[in-house]
């Protein structure tokens, strides 16, 4: 059953990633910086931080719902493989500043938003 939940969650997360990522990229009107991937990764980092706090402190997830949400939906939604590919493509295209900005923004802001997700969940259910 867990494999089916992960598969369904992964399908949902992948579709959400595609829709949000392509929309953000089209709104940004930028072909030089992967704003769509950045936004997906940052939102995913916040959400996983928030839900992790609930799972750890509130027991909010069963093993099945954890597999569905964390591994399935969020695993399909936040793919750092796309981040790596975008960064390598920027390097290949000679866009070193954008490549470094992409790495810095994804790593630093991603970690900050995981922390923020934990903190917000903690304060809401304190």
Task: Enumerate the language-model features and the residues they cover.
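Membrane-interface helix-loop junctions in multi-pass transporters/channels
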Residues: 1-126
């Amino acid at each position: 059953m867990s494999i089916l939940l992960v598969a369904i969650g992964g399908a949902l997360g992948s579709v959400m990633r595609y829709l949000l990522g392509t929309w953000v990229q089209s709104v940004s009107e930028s072909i030089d910086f992967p704003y769509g991937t950045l936004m997906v990764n940052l939102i995913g980092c916040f959400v996983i931080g928030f839900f992790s706090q609930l799972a750890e402190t509130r027991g909010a997830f069963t093993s099945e719902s954890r597999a569905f949400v964390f591994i399935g939906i969020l695993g399909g939604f936040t793919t750092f493989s796309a981040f790596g590919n975008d960064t390598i493509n920027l390097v290949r295209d000679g866009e070193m500043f954008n490549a470094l900005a992409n790495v810095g923004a994804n790593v630093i802001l991603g970690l900050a938003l995981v922390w923020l997700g934990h903190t917000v969940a903690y304060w809401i259910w304190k």
